[in-house]
Amino acid sequence: MRRSERAVTDPQMIREILDRAKVMHVGFVDQADPYVVPVNFGYTYEDDVLTLYFNSAVTGHKMDIIKENPTVFCTISVQDGLKDGGDNACSFSYYYASVMGKGRALRLTGNEEKRAALDILMKHQTGREGFVYGDSSLSRLAVLKVKLENFTAKMNPKA
């Protein structure tokens, strides 16, 4: 990380960034080409291990890529506004916080593990619990888990 003074290492601050964000961009490698998709997500962060969950249709381009190469790169960011630089364009900046890292997308197969992952995702997205997921709905839904092998967090906070 070039701007090491912006690094965030405190687990509670990392959780706060993740809690504020609702969309994650997942980058895939489609043969030699990048392919990036925005998705809603949920997460667990325990003992310095960050695990991300998202869902997808069972078939489609994302799933085809994952079968060939499950390596992904995830970015999560929160935008906090433009820092006005006056008349000097090079003095402008942006207030933000972000978490990003590399991992492998694993497709969950059992309905119970899908339900557990969807509970995490739905609680993150809505703040609510107690959702019902029918077996027929789950059969048409791919649920993916990405344990980040390494990740970084940084922020440029408003003063």
What is each residue range found by the language model?
Residues A21-V58, C74:
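Short beta-strand segments
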Residues H61-D84, F92:
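Helix-adjacent hinge/juxtasegments
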Residues I14, K62, K114-A117:
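Amphipathic alpha-helical interface surfaces
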Residues R2-R3, Q79-A159:
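Charged, gly/pro-rich active-site loop segments
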Residues M1-R20:
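Extreme N-terminal tail/first-helix region
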Residues I14-L18, V36-L52, K83-Y95:
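Short N-terminal helix-initiation segments at or just after the protein's N-terminus
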Residues D19, T59, K67-V72, K123-G127:
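Short, intrinsically disordered, mixed-charge
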Residues V23, V36-P38, T71, Y96, ...:
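Broad gene-expression machinery/nucleic-acid interaction feature
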